[in-house]
A protein has these predicted regions:
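N-terminal export/membrane-targeting signals
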Residues: 12-15
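N-terminal signal peptide c-region/cleavage motif recognized by signal peptidases
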Residues: 18-20
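N-terminal domain-start interaction segment
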Residues: 200
Length: 358
């Protein structure tokens, strides 16, 4: 079938920014956390409640905790090197999931977290330092691969999988496995990271990515054993539909962040049932993040299936336009994938915490 360019009208309108990516949006993260809340053993639930509700927080469960790692993106580094939590007056809706952490002590925790994890690695996606902590949300393994492996391009010691492993170690009371460009100061911080990153891990475009030449053809970074910057799509953030809404760019990555609207931001009975049907993970918990990343990478194959890419007009470096073999089929497939991945994320978050606190 001839490919046609389709406007993704159902996308969330966002600007193209490598640091703006937020798997599932806060609603999806809350769904993952809510599913896990339903599947915790009594022992794990008691630990979660105790850890999350120390200090100035009350009534925090995994559902409310899950957006925390996106809330810290409101922490801004100023030219004098100081960090401040700043509310965007033009986008007060960004603060909706962050209200459980409005107390001064919790705001200070976010500022402290960003400050400690700003320069532990260098992250300059647009030529400016954006803070190492922003790399904790993703890996960019080429979809030509069938497994997650540290030898592949698009992985690094501070990617999503490495960060999850570090948080697991902290909750287990063990040293963070080297190399360790992380500063996770306590179990509360580790649990806040896990509650969020287990959602990120199951968003296909936070693990798998396509690398493209200027004409939109797939390239393989593992052939040359290096990533050419001009081929990076930033997990689909640089793949647009060519339609601007309110002067903002629509892109493929953010479509995948947008969950089906009927799900709301809680655990539906259907998703909980699906989560209960997720097979248990074999082996030790320390091995699970890599196995789960492999599973998500294979799902990313399906997320990119039926898509084509072509250069923008006029051509722009590191920007492409998505095309579809069949738009409606793609919508239906992506909807089903999202539901399945949200269920997996919640099931595996609970499985992990249940294993830690047996």
């Amino acid at each position: 079938m001839m490919r046609t360019v389709i406007a993704l009208g159902w996308l969330v309108a966002v600007t193209l920014s490598p640091t703006a990516a937020s798997a599932w949006g806060y609603q999806g993260h809350r769904v993952v956390g809510a599913i896990a809340d339903r599947l915790l053993t009594p022992a794990a639930k008691a630990q979660v409640q105790q850890i999350l509700n120390e200090g100035d927080t009350r009534g925090i469960d995994l559902r409310k905790a899950a957006p925390w790692l996106d809330c810290v993106k409101s922490v801004v580094r100023h030219d004098d090197g100081r960090f401040h939590y700043e509310v965007d007056p033009d986008h007060l809706e960004y603060e909706v999931p962050c209200t459980p952490f409005n107390a001064a002590r919790e705001r200070a925790r976010m500022v402290d977290y960003v400050g400690r994890n700003w320069s532990t690695c260098s992250y300059t996606p647009d030529g400016f330092e954006r803070g190492c902590h922003n790399t904790f949300h993703f890996a960019d393994v080429a979809i030509q691969r069938d497994s997650f492996d540290r030898n592949f391009q698009g992985t690094n010691p501070h990617d999503l999988v490495a960060t999850i492993s570090a948080a697991i170690a902290v909750l287990q009371g063990k040293p963070i496995p080297p190399p360790f460009p992380f500063s996770i100061k306590d179990k509360k911080e580790a649990l806040l990271l896990l509650a969020h990153l287990m959602g990120d891990l199951h968003q296909p475009l936070h693990i798998g990515s396509v690398y493209l030449d200027p004409d939109g053809r797939l390239v393989d970074p593992d052939v040359a054993h290096k990533i050419e910057p001009e081929t990076e799509t930033i997990g689909g953030n640089a793949i647009q539909d060519g339609v601007a809404v309110s002067f903002q760019t629509l892109n493929l990555h953010h479509e995948w962040d947008d969950i089906p609207t009927d799900l709301g931001d809680a655990a539906t009975s259907e998703l909980v049932d699906a989560a209960k049907a997720v097979p248990p993970s074999p082996g030790l918990p320390e091995a699970w993040p890599v196995a789960w990343a492999t599973d998500t990478l294979l799902v990313a194959h399906d997320a990119f299936k039926g898509l084509g890419f072509k250069p923008t007009s006029p051509p722009a470096q590191n920007k492409w336009i998505v095309t579809f073999d069949n738009h409606m089929d793609y919508l239906q497939t992506s909807d089903a994938i999202k539901r399945k991945q949200l269920a997996k994320g919640g099931a595996r978050l609970a499985e992990l915490l249940n294993a830690i606190w047996q």
